[in-house]
């Protein structure tokens, strides 16, 4: 641990020293989610939303072999403009660091980094999951196994709608991951506020979610929680409208032989084209919405710990 090339930004280091709430943020949305300069603008906006609520943002990335917990302004800008950045999960983060590489962290790698840094809450857009056709391709995101073993509460707008949501929920149940939807009974569908799937659990406020996180820690249970936060109805694309668009994108990916890590970026880009940019607008709205909730959960965790005298 002493030799680990890990560095906190000045802002994150100060927040840790003062016991202030911190929320981890992933970096693949910057490098693989949207073009420059929009990616930089959105990253700054999400960070500023957290700061406005009294929470410190910790955007996580690997740069020149060092794992950064929080990026300085110039580092964020450099990452936003970088080309050919690796997309890191549990499988390849160590190799990237060992070879002095640069990479953006997915959900699984961000969870690992957050836990190493003592950060309990992480906000993202949507988690990865079981891809459609996984019964033959075995394409299942490492995010699901990470949720089962790393004790970080992840706030997302559900699983990405391009996935097989039913199978994703089944795997999460098998792995013992609590799936908590906020404020409604149905599991959200990323760009759409609701889906046909009932959420395993429901909670209506960040205080309860924070208490559940702490209870898992106290019980000695491994793994984190998935907090499914529906996109606001004013920002959503209804599921009935999206279904045929997703089907078209899936068919195009199959026709062009897109496989592995290339599948998700291809589908997101194709859906962006087919929705004439509305999917990206919704994505930005849901990421900001998730960050705000994550901030409230982080604040509740700190408050609960103070009350308990921990």
Curated annotation (Swiss-Prot):
Cofactor, how bound (note): Binds 1 Mn(2+) ion per subunit.
GO molecular function: hydrolase activity, acting on glycosyl bonds; metal ion binding; pseudouridylate synthase activity
Keywords associated with the record: Glycosidase, Hydrolase, Lyase, Manganese, Metal-binding
Assigned GO CC terms: cytoplasm
Binding-site list for Mn(2+): 139
InterPro entries in the cross-refs: Indigdn_synthA-like, PsuG
Active-site residue numbers: 26, 160
Root EC class: lyase
Cofactor(s), names only, from the UniProt record: Mn(2+)
Family as reported in the entry's similarity comment: Belongs to the pseudouridine-5'-phosphate glycosidase family.
Function: Catalyzes the reversible cleavage of pseudouridine 5'-phosphate (PsiMP) to ribose 5-phosphate and uracil. Functions biologically in the cleavage direction, as part of a pseudouridine degradation pathway.
PANTHER family attached to this UniProt entry: CARBOHYDRATE KINASE PFKB DOMAIN-CONTAINING PROTEIN, ZGC:136858
Subunit structure as annotated in this protein's UniProt entry: Homotrimer.
Protein's recorded name: Pseudouridine-5'-phosphate glycosidase
Organism from which the protein derives: Roseobacter denitrificans (strain ATCC 33942 / OCh 114) (Erythrobacter sp. (strain OCh 114))
Gene symbol of the encoding locus: psuG
């Amino acid at each position: 641990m002493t030799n680990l090339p890990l560095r906190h930004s000045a802002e994150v280091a100060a927040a840790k020293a003062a016991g202030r709430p911190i929320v981890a943020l992933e970096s693949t949305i910057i490098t693989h989610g949207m073009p420059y300069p929009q990616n930089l603008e959105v990253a700054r906006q999400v960070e500023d939303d957290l700061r406005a609520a009294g929470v410190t943002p910790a955007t996580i990335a690997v740069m020149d072999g060092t794992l950064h917990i929080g990026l300085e302004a110039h580092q964020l800008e450099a990452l936003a403009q970088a080309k050919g950045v690796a997309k890191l999960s549990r499988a390849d983060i160590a190799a990237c660091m060992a070879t002095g590489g640069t990479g953006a962290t997915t959900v699984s790698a961000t969870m690992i980094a957050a836990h190493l840094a003592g950060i309990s809450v992480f906000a993202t857009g949507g988690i990865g999951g079981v891809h459609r056709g996984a019964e033959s391709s075995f394409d299942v995101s490492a995010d699901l196994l990470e949720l089962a073993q790393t004790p970080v509460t992840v706030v997302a707008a559900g699983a990405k709608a391009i996935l097989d949501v039913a199978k994703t929920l089944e795997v999460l149940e098998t792995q013992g991951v609590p799936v908590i939807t906020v404020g409604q009974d149905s599991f959200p569908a990323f760009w759409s506020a609701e889906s046909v799937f009932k959420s395993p659990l429901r909670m209506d406020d960040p205080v309860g979610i924070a208490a559940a996180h702490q209870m898992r820690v106290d019980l000695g249970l491994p793994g984190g929680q998935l907090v499914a936060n529906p996109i606001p109805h004013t920002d959503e694309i209804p599921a009935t409208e999206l279904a045929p668009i997703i089907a078209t994108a899936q068919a195009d990916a199959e026709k062009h032989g897109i496989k592995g890590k290339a599948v998700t970026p291809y589908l997101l880009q194709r859906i962006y084209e087919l929705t004439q940019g509305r999917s990206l607008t919704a994505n930005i709205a849901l990421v900001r919405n998730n960050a705000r909730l994550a901030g409230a959960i982080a604040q509740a965790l700190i408050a609960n710990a103070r009350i308990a005298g921990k």
